[in-house]
Amino acid sequence: DLRQKAKSLKDFQQQKFGLFIHWGLYAIPAGIWNGQKMEDLGSPSVAEWIQLVAKIPRSTYAKLADQFSPQSFDADKIVKMAKDAGMKYLVVTSKHHDGFALYGSAVSSFNSKQATPFKRDIIQELYDACLRHKLDFGIYYSQNIDWRDGSDGQYAVTKAQHDLVHAKTDAFGVNLWDPSENSFASYLNEKAIPQVK
């Protein structure tokens, strides 16, 4: 309903102070790949883009999931810290551009519950803690960039079509080093849409 969306947007704008958590497999290499820092590899030089900047193959990057076991993770402690600091909301990356989700999924096993030794649903735990501590909760889900399952294999076709009419093709965030074979429709209908339902 449009009125509810407008109210939610207004409420969010009035809150002004909150916590946005970027967290995923990219925290493991911490901005360094094969001894090279992000700043030396290229741009953007932010840790969550390491797979793109270092051109890490999908199968190599997926092995980081074997190391993802944040035993000190405590959703209540994080939420309480935010609340005590006067924050009004918490937003967390449920799935970033690497395609790894911090919650279980029936459509992709590349997530914290199924692909890691941690075996926990981080999103659910943070959501439940926000309810307990009366802090608004939101998620960020990268739907247009997914270096694991996105439609980056279609980039060459799109670029060739654009080149014929001298149109520019935007390659921002595109996995050109190890693209999946998925079409945009298959990625959207078989992963992105069902994963957020």
Q: How would you label these PLM feature ranges?
A:
Residues 1-197:
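Mature catalytic domains of secreted/periplasmic carbohydrate-active enzymes
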